Amino acid sequence: MHSFTRKLFLYHTALFAGGFGAITVEARTPTGTVSLAYIARLYSMKTKLFGKKVLMENKYNKVEIETNSRRAYINGVMVWLHAPCRKHGNEWTIREVDFKGSMDPILRTYAYAPKRMPRLVVLDPGHGGRDTGSISPKGYKEKEIVLNISYKVKKLLEAKGIRVKMTRTGDTYPNLDVRSTYAYKVGADLFVSIHANAAGASSASGVETFITASSGYDSTNMYGQDQDTFAFKNNTYDAMNSVLGFSIHSNLVKMSKRDDRGLRRARYSVLKHTRCPSVLVECGFLTNPHEESLLNSPSYRELVARGIANGVLGYFTLIKRSLR
Ligand SMILES: [Zn+2]
């Protein structure tokens, strides 16, 4: 047994000792990677290669991974990998960090969930005051739209008995450090920053959700560019960031009916410094004519708010189940 094989073997045994019983399969892949065949065996999934995708499926879940790509789909929802799925010998592999920190927490939340129910949600309406955020061609301001959506999310969550606080309640600008510090001071159990997108091309459309990139890997929106890849306080929550991000993103896509741009990774200040599971949602593009009018309409804002609130409620339900 080569030393890297031994290390991987020990890691897998430790990781799955609870959920799967002792695993005695050797993974013959390079250190830091795990083969899709191996993952499929762990989940008792059937595997097939379909065009450029590897499909893995059991009775409960379906995972699709594009080969030589960072795109993966978990139960139909796009999740960006930190690094592309690559072939080593005969095996398609992904990085261990994407399996251990993302796919497995999403599929087996009970093995990662905190041992007590979350109590307080902090919502962070982006921008405010002198910082308007993006401005649409017709002059709609991101700071106003996201404050309105945040109030709708607050109302929906409070109707379900969940405590909610906001980093701003009016047209003010708490700086980015103040927002993370506020969440910590009030004892936030989860943090959701709410934004609207802008792009140079008016064709760009859809919704996307960000969580902190794992240490050592690029942000998905700055892939291959020079950037820091250090660990931050929020990386302690990598697994639950994925669970919260996936729950919110899948509900956001479902309710908004917009294009799915995926659950992505970025070291945004309000994510990386926040000391609880944290997510940043982009509710559509102010630079896309159709989405500009949607973002200006109360009915679309309500749908987006429902998507976010349902995602938070879904996260609460997953933790509640894991505590039984
Ligand atoms: Zn913004």
Feature-to-residue mapping (PLM):
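N-terminal secretory signal peptides and thylakoid transit peptides that target proteins
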Residues: 2-14
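Active-site-proximal helix/loop segments of hydrolytic enzymes
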Residues: 140-324
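Solvent-exposed, well-ordered amphipathic alpha-helical segments
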Residues: 1-3, 28, 41, 45, ...
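Primary recognition of N-terminal secretory signal peptides and signal-anchoring hydrophobic helices
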Residues: 20-131, 135-141, 148, 156, ...
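Short, cationic motifs built from Arg/Lys/His that form the positively charged side of catalytic pockets
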Residues: 5-7, 31, 37, 142, ...
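Compositionally biased regions
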Residues: 1-4, 19, 323
